[in-house]
UniProtKB/Swiss-Prot annotation:
CDD domains registered for this protein in UniProt: SIS_PGI_1 (cd05015), SIS_PGI_2 (cd05016)
This protein's pathway: Carbohydrate biosynthesis; gluconeogenesis; Carbohydrate degradation; glycolysis; D-glyceraldehyde 3-phosphate and glycerone phosphate from D-glucose: step 2/4
Main location: cytoplasm
Protein's name in the database: Glucose-6-phosphate isomerase
Length: 559
């Protein structure tokens, strides 16, 4: 297939049509019974099949959401009014849909098949991408088979990835998730400017057998460069300055700055300005993943995402999993007013997945201004949070079941675990996941609680005291994502599903999901305060709180 960049124009949607569709949806939401999930199951014995979609072994079950067939019809009308399909095509054709930075958004190109062509500014992106992938594969295989050695001639057995944000969250999450596929060096991750992070990591490593990846597009990210300099001095103090070129590689587009650091040009892995940080795991930022699991498994990871890309691009509206997922997210956030969503992977190796989605979702859709420069008149992206099951059950599930706020839950489940000899134990995990989903939906009435308490021998007076405390309202919405096994392919597909879901939610909200000016603002202020904190500048024209905090910190340091 051949793709071609189509220019910068991005159509402006018909706001009157969208507002009419949204108001129709809001009116529908006020009707009795729409949110009554229990009743929906009673009235439709085939609700599961009517309200679920499949893509090979991926099951997307949204039957436990407070919606009806009419809700789906109105949501589809909303998608048409928002021009979801047109905006989708704009992304796939290379239009500059990141309007504030005038950039194309082409992380999808990073996982395109090798025989496809995607022309942008006279270059075939697929060929450029494959060249970088081949570079990554050659280098990673040399490290993995021991032919690439450190400065003393010893084999590299530890990798330290130094990055932050998308240069850390994605690589760390994926590397941890794919632990059963590790047959390469041990991988460590350093991101925080807290000196404890780099110090604790280096304390257990041998300089002679350690390789550092410095992951920074601009090679100016403050936290990353600070940690990189500490690592550089650590190598120099043990092995000498000449060892830097053997013990450091970079993922960056700033070739001059990387060269100044002392990294050989043959060990610089390129990526492009159309790769956003939170979408960069598919690029050379994934080098640490490839070092851990090998090139073949990394390509399977890309293939899984590619399958979801293809489904997102060609599946009709009513059968399109990312679009349906996004419409439900919009329904929950904007129409129902649910302020957060809980991501609960019943997979310990996906324990970092909620944190990964926090950046992917909240950095993308935590916006208050529309594409046409107007303040939004509804709530934008939800707070995203979560933890792995069953751990979360013993921490915050109490609030999910009986708290005053309704919080939609997104369960992620795999039918099988990698530890086949522990299969009976894995059944406990699966049973708990299914039980929590059912409990949130079904609840337990006061009458049922009374019957249970009386049957257990508790007297009537005590029963009345306990009944309300032990009852559950139910009708709490949840979505279930089920796949066979956590593999490079299924993980890639899962991440791409969430990427496209978040993109479509941004379309519905009419915002730019691909900039992050709030993050940039924080960096700007930190750069202003740093020389003041170090006593190099005076603290003029600051608010009293900032001045007071600076004075307190400096005074305590001098004691």
């Amino acid at each position: 297939m051949r793709y071609k960049f189509m220019g910068d124009s991005l159509s402006i949607r018909n706001e009157k049509a969208f507002e009419a569709a949204l108001q129709a949806l809001r009116r529908h939401a006020t009707k009795d019974g729409v949110y009554d999930i229990r009743r929906h199951f009673v009235e439709d014995e085939q609700r599961f099949s009517h309200f679920s979609l499949r893509l090979d072994d991926l099951l997307f079950d949204f039957s436990k959401c407070g919606i009806t067939f009419k809700t789906l019809q109105l949501l589809d009308d909303l998608a048409v009014a928002a021009d979801v399909l047109g905006r989708r095509e704009a992304m796939f054709s290379g239009k500059a849909i990141n309007t504030t930075e005038k950039r194309s958004v082409l992380h999808i190109a990073l996982r395109m098949p090798t025989d496809e062509v995607f022309m942008l500014d006279g270059h075939d992106l697929v060929r450029d991408i494959q060249d970088v992938l081949a570079h990554m594969e050659r280098f990673s295989e040399m490290v993995r088979d021991g032919s690439y050695k450190g400065n003393t001639g010893e084999k590299i057995i530890n990798i330290v990835n130094i990055g932050i944000g998308g240069s850390d969250l994605g690589p760390a999450m994926v590397t941890h998730a794919l632990k059963p596929y590790h047959d390469g060096p041990h991988c460590h991750f350093v991101s925080n400017a807290d000196t404890a992070h780099i110090s604790d990591t280096l304390s257990v490593l041998n300089p002679a057998t350690t390789l550092f990846i410095i992951a920074s597009k601009t090679f100016t990210t403050a936290e990353t460069i600070a940690n990189a300099q500490v690592a550089r001095q650590w190598i120099i103090s043990h092995l000498g300055e000449e060892a830097v070129c053997r013990h450091f590689v970079a993922v960056s587009s700033a070739l001059d700055k990387v060269a100044e650091f002392g990294i050989d040009s043959s060990r610089i892995f390129k990526f492009w300005d159309w790769v956003g940080g939170r979408y960069s795991i598919w690029s050379a930022i994934g080098l640490v993943v490839m070092l851990a699991i090998g090139g073949q498994n990394f390509r399977q990871f890309l293939n899984g995402a590619q399958q979801m890309d293809r489904h997102f691009k060609i599946a009709p509206l009513h059968k399109n999993i990312p679009i349906r997922f996004a419409l439900l997210g919009f329904w929950h956030r904007v129409v129902c007013g649910y302020a957060s969503r809980a991501i609960i992977p019943y997979a310990q190796r996906l324990a970092r997945f909620p944190a990964y989605l926090q950046q992917l979702d909240m950095e993308s859709n935590g916006k208050q201004v529309s594409l046409d420069g107007k303040t939004l008149n509804f709530s934008s992206g939800p707070v995203v949070w979560g933890d792995s099951g069953t751990n979360g059950q013993h921490a915050f599930f109490q609030l999910l079941h009986q708290g005053t706020d309704v919080i939609p839950v997104e369960f992620i489940l795999f039918i099988k675990g990698h530890e086949q000899n522990l299969h009976p134990m894995y059944d406990i995990l699966v049973a708990n996941c299914l039980a929590q989903s059912k409990a949130l939906m079904k609840g337990r009435s006061v009458e049922d609680v009374r019957r249970i308490l009386v049957k257990s021998g508790i007297d009537v007076h005590e029963t009345e005291k306990l009944a309300l405390h032990k009852s559950f309202e139910g009708n709490r919405p949840s979505i279930m994502l089920v796949q066979d096994l956590l593999t490079p392919f299924t993980l890639g597909r899962l991440i791409a599903l969430y990427e496209h879901r978040i993109f479509v939610e941004g379309i519905l909200m009419n915002i730019n999901s691909f900039d992050q000016w709030g993050v940039e603002f924080g960096k700007e202020l930190a750069n202003e305060l740093l020389p003041i904190l170090r006593g190099e500048n005076k603290a003029n024209n600051r608010d009293s709180s900032t001045l007071g905090l600076l004075a307190y910190i400096q005074a305590r340091r001098e004691e």
